[in-house]
Amino acid sequence: MTSYSFTEKKRIRKDFGKHRSILKVPFLLAIQVDSYRAFLQGDVESSQRKDIGLHGALKSVFPIVSYSGNAALEYVGYKLGEPMFDERECRQRGMSYGAPLRVTVRLVIYDRESSTKAVKYIKEQEVYLGEIPLMTENGTFIVNGTERVIVSQLHRSPGVFFDHDRGKTHSSGKLLYSARIIPCRGSWLDFEFDPKDALFTRIDRRRKLPVSILLRALGYSNEEILGEFFEINTFHINPDKGVQLELVPERLRGEILSFNLTDGGGVIVEAGKRITARHVKQLEASGISALAVPDDYLIGRILSHDVIDATTGELLASANSEVNEDRIVAFRKAGIESVGTLWVNDLDRGAYLSNTLRIDPTRTQLEAQVEIYRMMRPGEPPTKEAAQNLFHNLFFTFDRYDLSMVGRMKFNRRVGRKEVAGEPVLYDKKYFSDRNDEESRRLVSKLGETSDILDVIKGLCEIRNGRGVVDDIDHLGNRRVRSVGEMAENVFRVGLVRVERAVKERLSMAESEGLTPQELINAKPVAAAIKEFFGSSQLSQFMDQNNPLSEVTHKRRLSALGPGGLTRERAGFEVRDVHLSHYGCLCTIETPEGPNIGLINSLAVFARTNQYGFLETPYRKVVEGRVTDEVEYLSAIEENQYVIAQANTLTDDNGQLTESFVPCRFQGESLLKPPSYVHYMDVSPMQTVSVAAALVPFLEHDDANRALMGANMQRQAVPTLRAQKPLVGTGIERTVALDSGVTVNARRGGVIDQVDAGRIVVKVNESEIIGATDAGVDIYGLIKYTRSNQNTCINQRPLVNVGDIIASGDVLADGPSTDIGELALGQNMLIAFMPWNGYNFEDSILLSERVVEEDRYTTIHIEELTCIARDTKLGSEEISADIPNVSEQALNRLDESGVVYIGAEVRAGDILVGKVTPKGESQLTPEEKLLRAIFGEKASDVKDSSLRVPPGMDGTVIDVQVFTRDGIEKDKRAHQIEEYEIKRVKKDFDDQFRILEGAIYARLRSQIVGKVVNSGVDIKKGEVITGPYLDGLKKSDWFALRMKDEVAVEAIDRAQKQIQAYQKEFDQRFSDKRSKITQGDDLAPGVLKMVKVFLAVKRCIQCGDKMAGRHGNKGVISNIVPVEDMPFMEDGTPVDIVLNPLGVPSRMNIGQILEVHLGWAAKGLGHRIQRMLEANAAIADLRKFLNEIYNHDKSLVGERVDLSQFSDDELLNMAKNLTDGVPMASPVFDGASEQEIKRMLDLAELPTGGQTQLYDGHTGEPFDRKTTVGYMHYLKLNHLVDDKMHARSTGPYSLVTQQPLGGKAQFGGQRFGEMEVWALEAYGAAYTLQEMLTVKSDDVQGRNQMYKNIVDGDHQMVAGMPESFNVLVKEIRSLAINIELEDN
């Protein structure tokens, strides 16, 4: 039985899951948080840090040695400082949340004169290397005041890959095989066959070279190359006639001989017959070691070695040349006894490298290296040294090439080596054994006879020969996840490499000029690289903050796009498709619709990344047909070799698999196997889906396309004014709400001491207090009415009361879209599926007025409007209430500084911040001169540029922030805000101090009451301390008390020290805060003052808003109908929403119907509980009824609810929370069956068919037949008609075409397009058409004249020449065709 926490006891979900959960859902943000923690290693001692992240990057670049080698800069360690501003201040001020990185480096200068490297002097110093962004505890970064998320990237793993072109390159359709070595950084190396079966190589996708050039550059001769890649047949040449072949019978298979093959006695194979496997066996059995063959058997074979006349030293035939009659004669003449030839055939022993050597123009190692140099650096004259250096730097030095740990592991596995660790560079035995430097000797002694490049070429030839398979690049074994930490590390290293170049230049001067490390290192390149990555990288995204689910999903997203990844245009179907290896790692449902489909995925619920960055998913181990509780994580590569059963496989009480054949997955196939064959079993039925898809109840009854829409639309739900838990959920709602970080969770257990709307104070349990300085009080500040990235409102509400006993992890306060710690994205609405006067045609939604009245879907949006006063050429702009030509009425909401009051209700066009801008002198008319002479000079030289409320917006001002540049005097409003802030902070600190002080005194009191006094204020020696005595004593006099009991005296001293320490700490913190508030702000160049005004906008639901269920059933509200007109039930209850029943069958999302039935049952059970409470039923009866609801079905696993844990008060409290409906959980792929839903309906005393008789609201008549009615969780999406509705009066025009701009943001017009023109033509409305194409569009003179005419009351128009005609003329002239208009 599970024990219930304080929060869970308030309301328990009835779970229909039949499978016991073995593994709790892991922390959902772990992929972000763990990755960045490993990158920073901030809490690890400097000496204990691993070579990853910041530490790894610094170690890989340092030491930096000068060109002369006389000076070096070594890395010692690093530490992260304290952030200057906390998260809240960074959001408010538009700053980035980060900590300064200080690296300790050591400058070592060596003595030039001494023969050994003697150290002349050492200087160690701390160097500032810029700000490193810090991650908030919810996995986000604050960059320039906005929350951003770094999305993890799914990219191709480094290593070696074999592939073919699918027959697309050559017209014959022949498969051309290729191999590619991809490093983590460095040059790519490709090998590929051409249609003539020669093998070529490319470096960095440049022009191809024969592969033998690369091998020759490594130091291999022709003979060595042939010896590596071919087996040799040896022929002994008889002096007079005939040849003896050293027989390996297997090598004759498939050949047709021109002579009989005998074994001394009988003929084994007749001439002209093909040798088969049977013949080969006979030959092996006969034991013949040599075979006499005629001379012509040798003709046409390829020599494996040079043949040299021993007496004269003459080269008779070179390796890789063919044997002909003349050469056989020459061999006999020179007395050559034996020659070796290559064993090749057309079937499975291709002569690929032999063909390649024939087209290779080079002969020596240097020639080959020069050829590679010419290909890499065309046009540069090659020198011996340059060619050698370039070749060495390509693949063999760690500075320029890094295969990485992952790449080496993948490489070694693919070429069939046992060990997975190794060197990050490509190794070749021949190349490194020929070199004589220390690093090469180390590599040769460690790695010996292996060769990476040769192994890859051999593997490619094997595949071409028909042995071996190509790789599937879409398999998750070949794609890995690059998370925040790794990307930040790569960016940091790039910055450091830029620093290294500059430092190397300066190091030579360091000795002569006595430079220090601080003078050597310029931190700008590092800081710039990091800032660029976090600020503007494709993977650094503005966080989707619509609701808690959208935050969690955004942080768990995996993108195949981004630097080093794919592009939308190039990605084909295969990459986007669902792959067999996605099972349990990537969600098979959730992905965006549109151009990114399949390129952006979501992590499955239980998936995680392993040390190499590959995705892995957990499985339960199955031993001899019995399922154990042991859980193992397997990656896509490992999973391939096991038989894995599904989570819903039937087992008995001991975990023994009961079916004779179990449905399983093995090597990507689905099949049935006996239980004894099964190795593993899924952990949970929802293992294959992501968090968003796992929130859709009855997902198993929905079509996948609609499930995809449902999962995606939940992310767009706007948090409503009062969140309401879904009546039908899946049981994962609580996990999502807790892990998203929008709720406030208790850090430690204890008792609630104080609660108000903005703060919760917890007195911590004695057992959880750590150390002597810990006062045992936790203070939680709540977020109040803050703007999210999507302009929705973030607000936290306390759930606890004073005196409540809580445990660690309990939910203390709800955030947006959470209800008692559960995710609550929408509202439970009473829904009827029926047509209603055509108002639900094409997915439209009919809504009851009652929904609007009860504010069920009212949402609060917070808009931030900014006014900036800049320094201009003509003088500085000024924020003031003194604005020319504006009525008093327009200014009545501004204070004397020209800024709107908090609490003012404003509408479109109202002034929020008054601002005047100086304008240039213009030529004045005589009338204006007269006016100026009369009324003075002032009003003319400034123009009004105030911040006004944008069109279509109205709301209440809830906050104003004024930022003033350093060195500029603050206005009155800024001082008021400053004073208010200081007062607020002071009160906050005073309250905190008072709470802590109170807790210390309370604890001290319990320790000294009843003790005997030695001395003290107003008390005699030997008296006993009592409570009333302490109450009458000043608090400071408590510390004068001295007792006989040493422990009590210690307690008094400890309390005094604690209070003094806290006092000092709070004073320090207050002075820090105060200086931050009073200091000037760091504004952009040229900005003198900035005012931010926050408006709270209340949006009621209205026609045109988009709504959706969780099953992809979306629609737009077509009409809001009075309650009395809505269809109603027998008892008079009107329905809330009417949906079209035709929206269900074609879309195949039947889950919504099941949800409606179960939701109705849940609501009915709530009504029954309410009736029992109203009738003051006995607690025992209530207990019995709840037991019937929760524990009716013995087949439901150990999740049964133990009501004996609940006291009567707790049970009553829970029952009150259930009156609105008993929440149900129908887990994905393990949900409620039809019988269970019927049983619930029965228990709720509702018709088990799920349909009821409805009556017409207009007439009161019953409808013809019964209707499906019930409760569905319905969401309001962030596609509100208020944001889309737009009308243009007079607005801006495009510069070139002079046509009105388009779009709401540009205050544009509606496009009158081609089809609209056809419509007017069809109606013959010639004048309207002329007006549309001229004065209402781009006839500049015409529209100006029209304006004047309307002002004069003359309603006529004269159409002129449209500007677009002039544009056309200019376009034609740009083609050098003159076109002129003639007056006719």
Swiss-Prot record:
This is DNA-directed RNA polymerase subunit beta. Belongs to the RNA polymerase beta chain family. GO terms for cellular component: DNA-directed RNA polymerase complex. It comes from Xylella fastidiosa (strain M12). Keywords: DNA-directed RNA polymerase, Nucleotidyltransferase, Transcription, Transferase. DNA-dependent RNA polymerase catalyzes the transcription of DNA into RNA using the four ribonucleoside triphosphates as substrates. GO terms for molecular function: DNA binding; DNA-directed RNA polymerase activity; ribonucleoside binding. Disulfide bonds: none annotated. CDD domains: RNA_pol_B_RPB2 (cd00653). It is an enzyme of class 2 (transferase). InterPro entries: DNA-dir_RNA_pol_bsu_external_1, DNA-dir_RNA_pol_su2, DNA-dir_RNAP_su2_dom, DNA-dir_RNAP_su2_hyb_sf, RNA_pol_bsu_bac, RNA_pol_bsu_CS, RNA_pol_bsu_protrusion, RNA_pol_Rpb2_2. The RNAP catalytic core consists of 2 alpha, 1 beta, 1 beta' and 1 omega subunit. When a sigma factor is associated with the core the holoenzyme is formed, which can initiate transcription. It catalyses: RNA(n) + a ribonucleoside 5'-triphosphate = RNA(n+1) + diphosphate. The keyword Transcription applies. It comes from the Bacteria. PROSITE patterns: RNA_POL_BETA (PS01166). Its EC number is 2.7.7.6. SUPFAM superfamilies: beta and beta-prime subunits of DNA dependent RNA-polymerase (SSF64484). One of its GO terms (biological process) is DNA-templated transcription.
